[in-house]
Amino acid sequence: MDKCKENCISGLKTTVPPGDGPKRVPVTQHFPAQHLPSANSGQAQRVLCPSNSSQRLPSHTQKLVSSHKPVQNLKQKQSQATSGPRPVSRPLSNTQQSEQPQPAAPGNNPEKEAASKQKNEESKKRQWALEDFEIGRPLGKGKFGNVYLAREKQSKFILALKVLFKTQLEKAGVEHQLRREVEIQSHLRHPNILRLYGYFHDATRVYLILEYAPLGAVYRELQKLSKFDEQRTATYITELANALSYCHSKRVIHRDIKPENLLLGSAGELKIADFGWSVHAPSSRRTTLCGTLDYLPPEMIEGRMHDEKVDLWSLGVLCYEFLVGKPPFEANTYQETYKRISRVEFTFPDFVPEGARDLISRLLKHNPSHRPTLKEVLEHPWITANSKPASSHKKESTSKQP
Protein backbone atom coordinates (compact mmCIF):
# COMPACT_ATOMS: atom_id res chain seq x y z
CA MET A 1 0.00 0.00 0.00
CA ASP A 2 1.54 3.29 -0.95
CA LYS A 3 2.12 5.94 1.67
CA CYS A 4 -0.59 8.26 0.38
CA LYS A 5 -3.29 5.64 0.73
CA GLU A 6 -2.00 4.57 4.12
CA ASN A 7 -2.29 8.12 5.41
CA CYS A 8 -5.81 8.37 3.97
CA ILE A 9 -7.01 5.54 6.16
CA SER A 10 -4.79 6.43 9.09
CA GLY A 11 -6.79 9.63 9.40
CA LEU A 12 -8.78 7.67 11.99
CA LYS A 13 -7.01 8.42 15.24
CA THR A 14 -6.66 5.48 17.56
CA THR A 15 -9.16 5.71 20.37
CA VAL A 16 -10.41 3.42 23.06
CA PRO A 17 -13.58 2.63 24.97
CA PRO A 18 -14.77 5.11 27.60
CA GLY A 19 -15.29 4.13 31.21
CA ASP A 20 -18.48 2.19 30.51
CA GLY A 21 -16.79 0.15 27.80
CA PRO A 22 -14.48 -2.84 28.19
CA LYS A 23 -13.70 -2.76 31.89
CA ARG A 24 -17.04 -2.91 33.70
CA VAL A 25 -18.55 -6.36 33.28
CA PRO A 26 -16.39 -9.38 34.06
CA VAL A 27 -17.51 -12.42 32.06
CA THR A 28 -16.07 -15.83 32.78
CA GLN A 29 -17.43 -17.62 29.72
CA HIS A 30 -14.49 -19.00 27.74
CA PHE A 31 -14.25 -19.46 24.02
CA PRO A 32 -11.20 -20.47 21.97
CA ALA A 33 -9.28 -17.80 20.11
CA GLN A 34 -9.27 -18.00 16.34
CA HIS A 35 -7.00 -16.47 13.73
CA LEU A 36 -8.33 -13.58 11.71
CA PRO A 37 -8.64 -14.44 8.00
CA SER A 38 -6.86 -12.63 5.24
CA ALA A 39 -8.59 -9.95 3.21
CA ASN A 40 -9.65 -12.52 0.62
CA SER A 41 -10.91 -15.12 3.08
CA GLY A 42 -14.45 -16.37 2.62
CA GLN A 43 -14.85 -17.23 6.30
CA ALA A 44 -17.75 -15.86 8.38
CA GLN A 45 -21.13 -14.87 7.10
CA ARG A 46 -22.31 -11.30 7.64
CA VAL A 47 -20.82 -8.00 8.64
CA LEU A 48 -22.42 -5.98 11.36
CA CYS A 49 -22.37 -2.37 10.28
CA PRO A 50 -21.06 -1.01 6.97
CA SER A 51 -23.73 0.16 4.57
CA ASN A 52 -21.94 -1.11 1.49
CA SER A 53 -24.73 -1.99 -0.89
CA SER A 54 -27.97 -0.53 -2.12
CA GLN A 55 -29.44 -3.99 -2.67
CA ARG A 56 -31.83 -5.82 -0.39
CA LEU A 57 -29.29 -8.46 0.58
CA PRO A 58 -28.71 -9.94 4.06
CA SER A 59 -25.30 -8.31 4.47
CA HIS A 60 -25.40 -6.51 7.82
CA THR A 61 -26.18 -8.57 10.88
CA GLN A 62 -24.79 -10.51 13.75
CA LYS A 63 -25.46 -14.20 14.08
CA LEU A 64 -27.32 -15.37 17.15
CA VAL A 65 -25.41 -16.96 19.99
CA SER A 66 -26.23 -20.55 20.87
CA SER A 67 -26.90 -19.78 24.52
CA HIS A 68 -30.25 -18.34 25.50
CA LYS A 69 -28.60 -16.33 28.26
CA PRO A 70 -26.97 -13.00 27.35
CA VAL A 71 -23.24 -13.01 27.85
CA GLN A 72 -23.07 -9.42 28.96
CA ASN A 73 -25.04 -6.66 30.60
CA LEU A 74 -24.21 -3.42 28.88
CA LYS A 75 -25.77 -0.50 30.73
CA GLN A 76 -26.27 2.59 28.65
CA LYS A 77 -25.17 5.93 30.10
CA GLN A 78 -27.36 8.44 28.34
CA SER A 79 -26.10 11.21 30.59
CA GLN A 80 -22.74 11.01 28.83
CA ALA A 81 -24.21 12.20 25.52
CA THR A 82 -22.28 15.08 24.05
CA SER A 83 -23.04 17.41 21.21
CA GLY A 84 -19.57 17.20 19.72
CA PRO A 85 -16.48 15.02 19.46
CA ARG A 86 -14.69 14.16 22.67
CA PRO A 87 -11.49 12.11 22.79
CA VAL A 88 -11.55 8.95 24.83
CA SER A 89 -8.64 7.06 26.28
CA ARG A 90 -7.95 3.55 27.44
CA PRO A 91 -8.99 2.95 31.09
CA LEU A 92 -6.16 3.39 33.56
CA SER A 93 -5.06 0.54 35.78
CA ASN A 94 -6.52 0.20 39.27
CA THR A 95 -3.35 1.67 40.78
CA GLN A 96 -3.42 4.68 38.52
CA GLN A 97 -7.14 5.23 39.03
CA SER A 98 -6.72 5.26 42.81
CA GLU A 99 -4.18 8.06 42.69
CA GLN A 100 -6.30 11.15 43.19
CA PRO A 101 -4.68 14.61 42.97
CA GLN A 102 -4.45 16.49 46.26
CA PRO A 103 -6.39 19.76 46.62
CA ALA A 104 -4.22 22.75 45.85
CA ALA A 105 -4.42 26.32 46.94
CA PRO A 106 -5.65 28.88 44.43
CA GLY A 107 -3.06 29.94 41.90
CA ASN A 108 -0.48 28.11 39.86
CA ASN A 109 0.72 24.73 41.09
CA PRO A 110 3.78 23.63 39.06
CA GLU A 111 3.86 20.14 40.58
CA LYS A 112 0.19 19.55 39.82
CA GLU A 113 0.56 20.85 36.28
CA ALA A 114 3.58 18.62 35.68
CA ALA A 115 1.74 15.58 37.05
CA SER A 116 -1.28 16.37 34.89
CA LYS A 117 0.90 16.74 31.80
CA GLN A 118 2.63 13.43 32.52
CA LYS A 119 -0.74 11.74 33.04
CA ASN A 120 -2.01 13.06 29.70
CA GLU A 121 1.11 11.85 27.91
CA GLU A 122 0.75 8.40 29.46
CA SER A 123 -2.91 8.32 28.47
CA LYS A 124 -2.04 9.06 24.86
CA LYS A 125 0.32 6.11 24.82
CA ARG A 126 -2.37 3.70 25.98
CA GLN A 127 -3.82 2.66 22.68
CA TRP A 128 -5.75 -0.48 21.84
CA ALA A 129 -4.09 -3.21 19.81
CA LEU A 130 -5.29 -6.55 18.53
CA GLU A 131 -3.27 -8.26 21.26
CA ASP A 132 -5.64 -6.76 23.86
CA PHE A 133 -8.47 -9.03 22.69
CA GLU A 134 -9.26 -12.72 22.56
CA ILE A 135 -10.94 -13.38 19.23
CA GLY A 136 -13.88 -15.79 19.20
CA ARG A 137 -16.21 -17.11 16.54
CA PRO A 138 -17.19 -15.06 13.49
CA LEU A 139 -20.51 -13.24 13.80
CA GLY A 140 -20.80 -12.10 10.22
CA LYS A 141 -19.17 -11.19 6.96
CA GLY A 142 -19.55 -8.30 4.56
CA LYS A 143 -17.98 -6.58 1.60
CA PHE A 144 -15.23 -4.84 3.54
CA GLY A 145 -14.45 -7.32 6.30
CA ASN A 146 -15.78 -9.45 9.13
CA VAL A 147 -17.24 -9.21 12.63
CA TYR A 148 -16.10 -11.43 15.49
CA LEU A 149 -17.20 -12.16 18.99
CA ALA A 150 -14.34 -10.95 21.16
CA ARG A 151 -13.29 -10.46 24.76
CA GLU A 152 -11.02 -7.79 26.19
CA LYS A 153 -8.34 -9.73 28.04
CA GLN A 154 -7.94 -7.58 31.13
CA SER A 155 -11.59 -6.90 31.99
CA LYS A 156 -13.12 -10.03 30.34
CA PHE A 157 -15.61 -7.68 28.71
CA ILE A 158 -17.55 -9.32 25.85
CA LEU A 159 -17.95 -7.26 22.70
CA ALA A 160 -18.08 -7.44 18.91
CA LEU A 161 -14.92 -6.62 16.97
CA LYS A 162 -15.51 -5.42 13.45
CA VAL A 163 -12.48 -5.86 11.18
CA LEU A 164 -12.33 -3.85 7.95
CA PHE A 165 -9.61 -4.23 5.34
CA LYS A 166 -8.00 -0.98 4.24
CA THR A 167 -7.35 -2.12 0.67
CA GLN A 168 -11.04 -2.87 0.16
CA LEU A 169 -12.12 0.43 1.73
CA GLU A 170 -9.72 2.30 -0.55
CA LYS A 171 -10.79 0.39 -3.63
CA ALA A 172 -14.45 1.27 -2.98
CA GLY A 173 -13.57 4.85 -2.08
CA VAL A 174 -15.50 4.77 1.20
CA GLU A 175 -12.80 5.89 3.64
CA HIS A 176 -14.67 9.15 4.25
CA GLN A 177 -17.88 7.23 4.87
CA LEU A 178 -16.17 5.09 7.52
CA ARG A 179 -14.75 8.17 9.23
CA ARG A 180 -18.19 9.74 9.28
CA GLU A 181 -19.78 6.57 10.65
CA VAL A 182 -17.20 6.35 13.44
CA GLU A 183 -17.43 10.05 14.24
CA ILE A 184 -21.21 9.93 14.57
CA GLN A 185 -21.79 6.56 16.23
CA SER A 186 -19.03 6.95 18.82
CA HIS A 187 -20.74 10.01 20.28
CA LEU A 188 -24.30 8.69 20.46
CA ARG A 189 -25.62 7.40 23.79
CA HIS A 190 -29.08 5.84 23.66
CA PRO A 191 -30.44 2.42 24.75
CA ASN A 192 -31.74 1.81 21.22
CA ILE A 193 -28.48 2.67 19.45
CA LEU A 194 -25.60 0.19 19.31
CA ARG A 195 -22.56 1.56 21.13
CA LEU A 196 -19.26 2.11 19.36
CA TYR A 197 -16.76 2.02 22.23
CA GLY A 198 -13.65 2.83 20.24
CA TYR A 199 -11.49 2.01 17.25
CA PHE A 200 -7.88 1.42 16.25
CA HIS A 201 -5.96 0.32 13.17
CA ASP A 202 -2.78 -1.35 11.99
CA ALA A 203 -1.01 -1.45 8.63
CA THR A 204 -3.75 -3.37 6.84
CA ARG A 205 -6.94 -3.23 8.88
CA VAL A 206 -9.30 -0.95 10.80
CA TYR A 207 -10.93 -2.33 13.95
CA LEU A 208 -14.21 -1.09 15.45
CA ILE A 209 -14.95 -2.04 19.08
CA LEU A 210 -18.73 -2.48 19.22
CA GLU A 211 -21.42 -3.40 21.70
CA TYR A 212 -22.42 -7.04 21.31
CA ALA A 213 -26.10 -7.66 20.52
CA PRO A 214 -26.75 -11.28 21.60
CA LEU A 215 -30.14 -11.76 19.94
CA GLY A 216 -28.98 -10.98 16.43
CA ALA A 217 -30.58 -9.08 13.58
CA VAL A 218 -34.18 -8.00 13.13
CA TYR A 219 -33.86 -8.97 9.47
CA ARG A 220 -33.09 -12.57 10.41
CA GLU A 221 -36.10 -12.70 12.73
CA LEU A 222 -38.32 -11.28 10.01
CA GLN A 223 -37.10 -13.88 7.52
CA LYS A 224 -37.76 -16.65 10.01
CA LEU A 225 -41.27 -15.50 10.99
CA SER A 226 -42.30 -13.96 7.61
CA LYS A 227 -43.97 -11.06 9.43
CA PHE A 228 -44.45 -9.65 12.94
CA ASP A 229 -47.65 -9.24 14.94
CA GLU A 230 -49.09 -5.86 15.95
CA GLN A 231 -47.49 -5.76 19.40
CA ARG A 232 -44.00 -6.56 18.22
CA THR A 233 -44.26 -4.13 15.31
CA ALA A 234 -45.60 -1.28 17.46
CA THR A 235 -42.91 -1.92 20.08
CA TYR A 236 -40.11 -1.84 17.54
CA ILE A 237 -41.51 1.32 15.93
CA THR A 238 -41.70 2.96 19.36
CA GLU A 239 -38.08 2.10 20.18
CA LEU A 240 -36.91 3.22 16.76
CA ALA A 241 -38.86 6.48 16.95
CA ASN A 242 -37.26 7.21 20.34
CA ALA A 243 -33.79 6.52 18.94
CA LEU A 244 -34.39 8.68 15.86
CA SER A 245 -35.77 11.47 18.01
CA TYR A 246 -32.51 11.40 19.97
CA CYS A 247 -30.48 11.40 16.73
CA HIS A 248 -32.40 14.33 15.33
CA SER A 249 -31.88 16.25 18.57
CA LYS A 250 -28.16 15.82 17.90
CA ARG A 251 -28.71 16.96 14.32
CA VAL A 252 -27.96 13.50 12.93
CA ILE A 253 -30.02 12.09 10.04
CA HIS A 254 -29.72 8.32 9.62
CA ARG A 255 -31.00 7.94 6.01
CA ASP A 256 -30.77 4.14 5.87
CA ILE A 257 -33.27 2.64 8.30
CA LYS A 258 -34.06 -0.97 7.31
CA PRO A 259 -34.26 -4.40 9.02
CA GLU A 260 -30.67 -5.27 8.03
CA ASN A 261 -29.38 -2.33 10.08
CA LEU A 262 -31.28 -3.18 13.26
CA LEU A 263 -30.07 -5.57 15.97
CA LEU A 264 -31.63 -6.94 19.15
CA GLY A 265 -30.11 -6.49 22.60
CA SER A 266 -30.17 -8.99 25.45
CA ALA A 267 -33.66 -7.88 26.54
CA GLY A 268 -35.00 -8.04 22.99
CA GLU A 269 -34.77 -4.28 22.59
CA LEU A 270 -34.14 -2.87 19.13
CA LYS A 271 -30.80 -1.18 18.40
CA ILE A 272 -29.78 0.85 15.36
CA ALA A 273 -26.47 -0.70 14.35
CA ASP A 274 -25.33 1.00 11.15
CA PHE A 275 -24.56 4.68 10.63
CA GLY A 276 -22.72 4.32 7.33
CA TRP A 277 -25.09 6.64 5.47
CA SER A 278 -25.87 8.97 8.37
CA VAL A 279 -24.84 12.62 8.30
CA HIS A 280 -24.52 15.59 10.61
CA ALA A 281 -26.97 18.21 9.42
CA PRO A 282 -26.07 21.44 11.26
CA SER A 283 -28.04 23.69 8.92
CA SER A 284 -27.91 22.47 5.35
CA ARG A 285 -30.24 20.10 3.57
CA ARG A 286 -28.81 17.09 1.79
CA THR A 287 -29.11 16.10 -1.88
CA THR A 288 -26.95 12.95 -1.98
CA LEU A 289 -28.61 9.73 -3.14
CA CYS A 290 -27.76 6.93 -0.73
CA GLY A 291 -29.29 4.09 1.24
CA THR A 292 -31.45 1.22 0.01
CA LEU A 293 -33.91 1.89 -2.82
CA ASP A 294 -36.89 0.14 -1.18
CA TYR A 295 -36.63 2.56 1.76
CA LEU A 296 -35.71 5.79 -0.02
CA PRO A 297 -38.32 8.59 -0.08
CA PRO A 298 -39.40 10.43 -3.25
CA GLU A 299 -37.32 13.51 -2.48
CA MET A 300 -34.11 11.46 -2.40
CA ILE A 301 -34.62 9.31 -5.49
CA GLU A 302 -35.67 12.44 -7.39
CA GLY A 303 -32.52 14.25 -6.27
CA ARG A 304 -34.39 16.96 -4.38
CA MET A 305 -33.35 18.59 -1.12
CA HIS A 306 -34.08 16.51 1.96
CA ASP A 307 -33.87 16.72 5.73
CA GLU A 308 -34.68 14.57 8.79
CA LYS A 309 -38.13 13.81 7.35
CA VAL A 310 -36.47 11.10 5.24
CA ASP A 311 -36.25 9.03 8.43
CA LEU A 312 -40.02 9.37 8.92
CA TRP A 313 -40.62 7.92 5.47
CA SER A 314 -38.30 5.00 6.25
CA LEU A 315 -40.19 4.45 9.50
CA GLY A 316 -43.40 4.04 7.50
CA VAL A 317 -41.77 1.58 5.08
CA LEU A 318 -40.37 -0.39 8.01
CA CYS A 319 -43.73 -0.55 9.77
CA TYR A 320 -45.31 -1.88 6.58
CA GLU A 321 -42.59 -4.51 6.08
CA PHE A 322 -42.85 -5.67 9.69
CA LEU A 323 -46.60 -6.29 9.32
CA VAL A 324 -46.67 -7.56 5.72
CA GLY A 325 -43.27 -9.22 5.30
CA LYS A 326 -42.06 -7.14 2.35
CA PRO A 327 -41.58 -3.43 1.57
CA PRO A 328 -44.61 -1.55 0.17
CA PHE A 329 -42.91 -0.48 -3.08
CA GLU A 330 -41.10 -3.72 -3.87
CA ALA A 331 -41.12 -4.61 -7.59
CA ASN A 332 -39.27 -6.85 -10.04
CA THR A 333 -36.97 -4.09 -11.29
CA TYR A 334 -35.34 -0.98 -9.86
CA GLN A 335 -37.10 1.10 -12.49
CA GLU A 336 -40.52 -0.12 -11.38
CA THR A 337 -39.68 0.37 -7.70
CA TYR A 338 -38.48 3.88 -8.48
CA LYS A 339 -41.72 4.63 -10.30
CA ARG A 340 -43.89 3.29 -7.48
CA ILE A 341 -42.02 5.34 -4.88
CA SER A 342 -42.30 8.53 -6.95
CA ARG A 343 -46.05 8.01 -7.28
CA VAL A 344 -46.45 6.62 -3.73
CA GLU A 345 -48.27 3.60 -5.14
CA PHE A 346 -48.87 0.85 -2.61
CA THR A 347 -51.75 -1.22 -1.27
CA PHE A 348 -52.50 -2.94 2.04
CA PRO A 349 -53.30 -6.65 2.37
CA ASP A 350 -56.64 -7.28 4.07
CA PHE A 351 -55.03 -8.47 7.31
CA VAL A 352 -53.30 -5.14 8.07
CA PRO A 353 -55.28 -3.47 10.91
CA GLU A 354 -56.94 -0.12 10.35
CA GLY A 355 -54.85 1.68 12.96
CA ALA A 356 -51.61 0.57 11.34
CA ARG A 357 -52.91 1.57 7.91
CA ASP A 358 -53.60 5.06 9.21
CA LEU A 359 -50.11 5.48 10.68
CA ILE A 360 -48.32 4.10 7.61
CA SER A 361 -50.40 6.24 5.24
CA ARG A 362 -49.52 9.34 7.27
CA LEU A 363 -45.81 8.51 7.17
CA LEU A 364 -45.70 7.70 3.44
CA LYS A 365 -46.59 11.17 2.18
CA HIS A 366 -44.91 12.48 -0.97
CA ASN A 367 -44.56 15.93 0.57
CA PRO A 368 -42.13 15.66 3.52
CA SER A 369 -43.82 18.50 5.38
CA HIS A 370 -47.05 16.48 5.46
CA ARG A 371 -45.45 13.61 7.39
CA PRO A 372 -46.03 13.51 11.15
CA THR A 373 -43.33 14.29 13.68
CA LEU A 374 -41.72 11.52 15.71
CA LYS A 375 -43.63 12.79 18.74
CA GLU A 376 -46.89 12.36 16.83
CA VAL A 377 -45.83 8.84 15.83
CA LEU A 378 -45.25 7.93 19.47
CA GLU A 379 -48.65 9.36 20.39
CA HIS A 380 -50.54 7.62 17.58
CA PRO A 381 -53.47 5.55 18.98
CA TRP A 382 -52.35 2.34 17.28
CA ILE A 383 -48.84 2.70 18.73
CA THR A 384 -50.00 3.47 22.28
CA ALA A 385 -52.50 0.60 22.19
CA ASN A 386 -50.02 -2.05 21.04
CA SER A 387 -46.53 -1.03 22.14
CA LYS A 388 -45.06 -2.71 25.21
CA PRO A 389 -41.83 -2.33 27.22
CA ALA A 390 -38.77 -4.08 25.82
CA SER A 391 -38.36 -6.16 28.99
CA SER A 392 -41.76 -7.75 28.51
CA HIS A 393 -40.78 -9.33 25.19
CA LYS A 394 -37.39 -10.61 26.39
CA LYS A 395 -38.78 -14.08 27.02
CA GLU A 396 -40.55 -14.09 23.66
CA SER A 397 -37.37 -13.14 21.81
CA THR A 398 -35.04 -15.56 23.60
CA SER A 399 -37.46 -18.46 23.31
CA LYS A 400 -37.23 -18.25 19.52
CA GLN A 401 -33.48 -18.75 19.31
CA PRO A 402 -32.31 -21.88 17.46
Curated annotation (Swiss-Prot):
User: What ranges does the record give for the region Activation segment, renumbered to this chain?
Assistant: 280-293
GO CC annotations, alphabetized: basolateral plasma membrane; centriole; centrosome; chromosome passenger complex; ciliary basal body; cytoplasm; kinetochore; mitotic spindle pole
Q: Which GO terms describe its molecular function?
A: ATP binding; protein kinase activity; protein serine kinase activity; protein serine/threonine kinase activity
UniProt keyword Cytoplasm present? yes
Known catalysed reaction(s)?
L-seryl-[protein] + ATP = O-phospho-L-seryl-[protein] + ADP + H(+); L-threonyl-[protein] + ATP = O-phospho-L-threonyl-[protein] + ADP + H(+)
Q: What is its EC number?
A: 2.7.11.1
Q: Where is this region: Disordered?
A: 1-125
Task: Give start-end positions of Polar residues composition bias.
Answer: 37-83, 91-101
| PTM info | Activated by phosphorylation at Thr-288; this brings about a change in the conformation of the activation segment. Phosphorylation at Thr-288 varies during the cell cycle and is highest during M phase. Autophosphorylated at Thr-288 upon TPX2 binding. Thr-288 can be phosphorylated by several kinases, including PAK and PKA. Protein phosphatase type 1 (PP1) binds AURKA and inhibits its activity by dephosphorylating Thr-288 during mitosis. Phosphorylation at Ser-342 decreases the kinase activity. PPP2CA controls degradation by dephosphorylating Ser-51 at the end of mitosis.
Q: What is this protein called?
A: Aurora kinase A
Protein's organism: Sus scrofa
